Amino acid sequence: MLKTISGTLALSLIIAASVHQAQAATTYNAVVSKSSSDGKTFKTIADAIASAPAGSTPFVILIKNGVYNERLTITRNNLHLKGESRNGAVIAAATAAGTLKSDGSKWGTAGSSTITISAKDFSAQSLTIRNDFDFPANQAKSDSDSSKIKDTQAVALYVTKSGDRAYFKDVSLVGYQDTLYVSGGRSFFSDCRISGTVDFIFGDGTALFNNCDLVSRYRADVKSGNVSGYLTAPSTNINQKYGLVITNSRVIRESDSVPAKSYGLGRPWHPTTTFSDGRYADPNAIGQTVFLNTSMDNHIYGWDKMSGKDKNGNTIWFNPEDSRFFEYKSYGAGATVSKDRRQLTDAQAAEYTQSKVLGDWTPTLP
């Protein structure tokens, strides 16, 4: 018996030592901490990014727990942010599209972003990215209040057309209107949590979401029986095969205060675009959102329409049936099969595997 116990103890010590060695073997090119004063650790993420050498070799930054009030633009390829924990390592800013710059101009939707990705092969893991613009407080103001911001889009994460192969693992994105803007390349979101109200996942990029929570937030400014928001607003070009693809995920409510049938799965965004014959809603933005094997709470009612401007400046409507909006094996209180919620066949659903959506890119972490 003693021999067996000794052997078990020895094995346990070997395993513990192996785990310790594996952790010690994890190397970071830079470490960020709000509390360290050893002279080797950066106090801001921006300073850590600036320390990365030119080139495109992998550069990995460990972000210790803390709230970092920073706005970041990533332009270096192969940069990787690793948080100490998803809820503990927080990058936050509070800028809305209507927030004024020092010169009096507005930041605009894209300019409101807390983090902007304009590089290839970026990754973020185990951290939170927030846009802390106080949407509820702003909406509670009187329309006659000069401090009330009219353009309330407030992006937490923006992947630009210069971005490609952006990988987000165990990341929380927090905002209200326009939380996540994917405008270019390919992005992969795995085990993530994305919360918002109006069009909180939008854009014309290709983005695959797997095992994610899409969280609809409560709005005190919306009267009972009215629509509170929309999960997606894709503007995918007609020649692009994939847009926003959500698989094996959960469409949930922030709390029971979110009413039943108050959120749409998506609406078609045709962004106002300048053409040779004028400026009007892009007719080629035949947006795609597809939900596969995803559970839906009862706050979901289906798809919706969205307005735009024609060549003469008149309001026109774009209907969901004219877009690429589909579901496959949705389930839960918010799932239903009807003519207004088109379903994929098994053969069609087979076209939405990770390898097909992301092509020649297999997401990996450093």
From Swiss-Prot:
NCBIfam families: pecestase_PemA. One of its GO terms (biological process) is pectin catabolic process. The active site is at 178 (proton donor), 199 (nucleophile). PANTHER family: ACYL-COA THIOESTER HYDROLASE YBHC-RELATED, PECTINESTERASE 53-RELATED. The keyword Protease does not apply. Pathway: Glycan metabolism; pectin degradation; 2-dehydro-3-deoxy-D-gluconate from pectin: step 1/5. The keyword Ribonucleoprotein does not apply. This is Pectinesterase A. The gene is pemA. Its EC number is 3.1.1.11. Disruption phenotype: Decreased growth on methylated oligogalacturides; double pemA-pemB deletions grow very poorly on methylated oligogalacturides. Keywords: Aspartyl esterase, Cell wall biogenesis/degradation, Disulfide bond, Hydrolase, Secreted, Signal. Belongs to the pectinesterase family. It is found in: Secreted. Substrate binds at residues 109, 153, 219, 226, 230, 267, 269, 272. Catalyzes the first step in maceration and soft-rotting of plant tissue. Pfam families: Pectinesterase (PF01095). Disulfide bonds join 192-212. GO terms for cellular component: cell outer membrane; extracellular space. Transmembrane segments: none annotated. Changing residue 199 to A: Loss of activity.
